[in-house]
A protein has these predicted regions:
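Short, surface-exposed beta-strand-loop junctions and turns on beta-sheet-rich folds
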Residues: 42-44, 63, 125-127
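A short, well-structured catalytic beta-strand-centered motif of the EAL phosphodiesterase domain
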Residues: 24-28
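A short, Trp-centered hydrophobic/proline-enriched beta-strand micro-motif
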Residues: 1-16, 54-58
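Short His-Asn-centered micro-motif
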Residues: 37-39, 59
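Residue-level signal for well-ordered, solvent-exposed loop/turn and beta-edge residues enriched
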Residues: 16-18, 75
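Short active-site oxyanion
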Residues: 31-35
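Short, structured beta-strand-loop surface elements
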Residues: 47-97, 101-114
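C-terminal edge-of-domain segments
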Residues: 101-152
Length: 152
């Protein structure tokens, strides 16, 4: 997912329960989850710490009928700076955004460790759609019933 969907839109809730979105780059993934960065002074950081949950959607493709969309909803944990250097080295453009040790000291790493998701691929015929879960989360099937011969 990271290579196909690097920049995603993440949503958290503010203090009033309203959704707030922001664009975030997925820095890496492994068997533990998806890793991303934020600065400790941002409102996004405060919402992650308070709620511990987010939703993200990433889209890849040239036009509507060639697009793949992935949505993930899950729990997040702060890892801190323990793997920050590895993530920055893997995504070296981040050194241009945060060029000094001082500026990088504001960064912290989070990972999405448990959740559900959906893969939706309009480039395939018939359209490919499936649900997945990770981090020992129970699978939540998506879709709906239309008729015995048609499900979406």
């Amino acid at each position: 997912m990271k290579s196909a969907l690097h920049t995603v839109i993440m949503a958290t809730n503010d203090d009033n329960g309203n959704p707030v979105t922001c664009a975030v780059d997925i820095m890496d993934y492994d068997e533990n989850g998806l890793y991303f960065l934020t600065a400790k002074g941002k409102n996004f950081y405060s919402r992650l710490k308070k709620n511990g949950y987010l939703s993200l959607t990433g889209i890849n493709g040239e036009d509507t009928m060639s697009r793949v969309a992935v949505t993930v909803c899950g729990k997040v944990k702060e890892v801190g700076s323990e793997c920050l250097k590895r993530l920055l080295d893997k995504n070296s453009y981040m050194y241009e955004i945060y060029p000094t040790e001082c500026s990088r000291s504001a960064l912290t790493v989070f990972y999405i460790y448990k959740g559900n998701g959906e893969w939706f691929d309009l480039s395939k015929k018939p359209i490919e759609r499936y649900s997945f879960s990770f981090g020992s989360e129970d699978l939540k099937e998506v879709g709906y019933f239309i008729t015995d011969k048609c499900n979406a």
